[in-house]
UniProtKB/Swiss-Prot annotation:
Enzyme class: transferase
Compartment(s) of residence: Cell inner membrane
HAMAP family: Acetyltr_WecH (MF_01949)
Function field: Responsible for the incorporation of O-acetyl groups into the enterobacterial common antigen (ECA) trisaccharide repeat units. Catalyzes the acetylation of both cyclic ECA (ECA(CYC)) and phosphoglyceride-linked ECA (ECA(PG)).
Single biological process term from Gene Ontology: enterobacterial common antigen biosynthetic process
Segments in the Cytoplasmic topological domain: 1-12, 67-78, 135-138, 190-202, 256-266, 321-331
Protein name (database record): O-acetyltransferase WecH
Organism whose genome encodes this protein: Escherichia coli (strain K12)
Domain of life: Bacteria
Disruption outcome: Mutant is defective in the incorporation of O-acetyl groups into both ECA(CYC) and ECA(PG).
Family membership: Belongs to the acyltransferase 3 family.
Gene behind this protein: wecH
Alphabetic keyword roster: Acyltransferase, Cell inner membrane, Cell membrane, Membrane, Transferase, Transmembrane, Transmembrane helix
Amino acid sequence: MQPKIYWIDNLRGIACLMVVMIHTTTWYVTNAHSVSPVTWDIANVLNSASRVSVPLFFMISGYLFFGERSAQPRHFLRIGLCLIFYSAIALLYIALFTSINMELALKNLLQKPVFYHLWFFFAIAVIYLVSPLIQVKNVGGKMLLVLMAVIGIIANPNTVPQKIDGFEWLPINLYINGDTFYYILYGMLGRAIGMMDTQHKALSWVSAALFATGVFIISRGTLYELQWRGNFADTWYLYCGPMVFICAIALLTLVKNTLDTRTIRGLGLISRHSLGIYGFHALIIHALRTRGIELKNWPILDIIWIFCATLAASLLLSMLVQRIDRNRLVS
């Protein structure tokens, strides 16, 4: 049995909370003309800070499976059963409580997830599939820094184009295409950074500063896009974008350095139920929003309410499923 890795547990708990926060604040950031500028800005900052959640999940999986140990048949079974189980729950919810075309959802089951958040199960399967082929080596800090700068920023196709007198100098075209490339890269970086000796106080401070700066740039960039487009655009929110890339690496390093001696009680609970929380949370948020069980006249209270109610309900449902699912196949 593998020894417990405290920082992984804590990081998984943080990432899970961030996913819930993303979907809690989505209505506000995508409906800028229906809310006050202050409300939109608060929701935007919260959403910007939470964009690292998905990259962190890929990094955690990479740390666990891109080393001596790769994904085993039981891991593929689990991801397949999770996709089937939570798709079935989503289909039941769609049939009973929405006007979404269930027949169309079934027809496109292998091309498009039944409910938007279930895309992650398809994407994480790729990490499992390539894990027998990848064993990340120990890499020096300077080499890793250069690699991250080039692939994550300079040659990242999601980098906002920069031009001087019509000459485009960023991003450089290294023919990197597709989000899956970055999902696998996140996994490899999770393993590489996880193996490195990062226990330096100065590095922790630099990581914290980088994360805060990255969140500021993401939020201000999104505000700028809103102002010149007249509507919301996710240019700076992209999971494979350069600023989210930097923030994910910074937060991983910070948590690894500061939360590695024990599992924080609350985060440990969330971590143990992260799969169930992820599977249920989007349905609960949709139900609360569409049934008007919200506090939109008090936006800040509404964000707190939706977040807490969703987390509590998802956690309870996960606990119920775990009582039945003794082998933890879908919970």
